[in-house]
Amino acid sequence: MALMVNAKGGNGGKEWDDGFDYEGVTKIHVRAGSEGIQFIKFDYVKVGKTIDGPIHGVSGLGMTQTFEINHLQKEYLVSIEGYYDKSTGVIQSIQFKTNVKTSDMMGFNKGTKFSLGIIRNKIIGFHGFSDKNVYSLGAYFIKVLATKSGMQGGQNTGKSYDYGGDYDGIRKVYVTYDGTSIRHMRVDYDKAGQVECYEYGDKTGTQYKITVNYPYECITSVEGSYANTQPYGCIVLRSLTFKTSNGRTLVIGTVTGTKFLLESKGNAIVGFHGRVGSCVDSIGAYYAPFSPSPPPTQKLEGQGGDGGDSWDDGAFLNVKKVYIGQGSNGIVAVKFEYENDASEVVVGDEHGKTTLLGYEVFELDYPNEYITSLEGCHDKVMGAETGVITMLRFKTNKRTSPPFGLEAGVNFVLQKESHKITGFHGKSSTMLHQIGVHVVPITE
């Protein structure tokens, strides 16, 4: 039975539902206009035949972009990301990801971000709301069965072990190495948020461990080697190297004999099987689609006065530049440059009003540097009915910026331990009255 995920995006439009009586999606048509996404259309696969879906929205001026999914080559849609305008409710841009590739961002990547995706699932149908534009999208998901690889190493010795075909991901792997051979393995699996542990072999030697930051990270490949080894008189594993989606690596043992690689592009390793005796004789993998969940965003309350209009840039992948405009009595304007998940630069709106002095710029050494805290001051100054921000100072994982403005009034700090700042919100008029931040856990 398909799982229905509620529509994400803005409010507005009339409800539509393509249903879920399909095997998958094979083609997507999107047209963007000046107000955002004008229409969207999906072609589905049912009993091996293409089903032409209806248009949702209105076909106006603009260029239609298409994204094809080769279902004949076992390609399928796993997730969607996009942005919508909170004021109009219209989706501004959208991007699709399969187990093989990712589409271009269709439309303009501005506004509030949304996403649709479930680990180990694929999208087979859509529903949502539209009128003259597309306001929101929801999807139907079904679980994708893991694919089992062949075994690498000894094929007939020892006894069989087989775990992971029904698990969502891997949280930890422990490997024991005695200086010659891989003797023992323990794997902590995740199943619907619960951890299940399995181990096999003889725990003799030095134990190594890799902790996977699931669901934000996965194991993407395992390299290794095997050889006929004494005193066991059979083929056993001599080395293993685990690699993750975050670029981390754990190397165990010395490459000896026949080398192998367990990897499936676009998929994560979610389990292992093989044979084991006094040593781990062989190893194989289970592969499944994996779209790392974005770290949960937390909005920290703004600090300062209550004047001006509210604004919110939202949360992004990281901050690249900070622009600060100063006046005679405090900070008059700020603007931020971000990078989104599609590695595209997003320049935020100006909040406040700059003077002839223009902006000072604090540029980060992205992607190696990120903001960990924001310090500042606010005070009630001449010419302002409510408090204004008088000083801002940014701390990163590498350094501290100079203070921008005057340290006068009430001090404040915006930070959360083991988190980084990825977006800003606040209140402004012709001055900056209040500022707050969006933070996410540090996963690097």
Swiss-Prot record:
Record keywords, A-Z: Acetylation, Lectin, Repeat
GO cellular component, one term: plasmodesma
Species: Arabidopsis thaliana
SUPFAM superfamilies per UniProt: Mannose-binding lectins
Sites of N-acetylalanine modification: 2
Keyword Repeat found: yes
One Pfam family named in its UniProt record: Jacalin
GO molecular function terms listed in the Swiss-Prot or TrEMBL record: carbohydrate binding
Ranges where the Jacalin-type lectin domain occurs: 2-143, 146-289, 297-441
Protein name from the UniProt record: Jacalin-related lectin 41
Family annotation (Gene3D superfamilies): Jacalin-like lectin domain
Family to which this protein belongs: Belongs to the jacalin lectin family.
Record flagged with keyword Repeat: yes
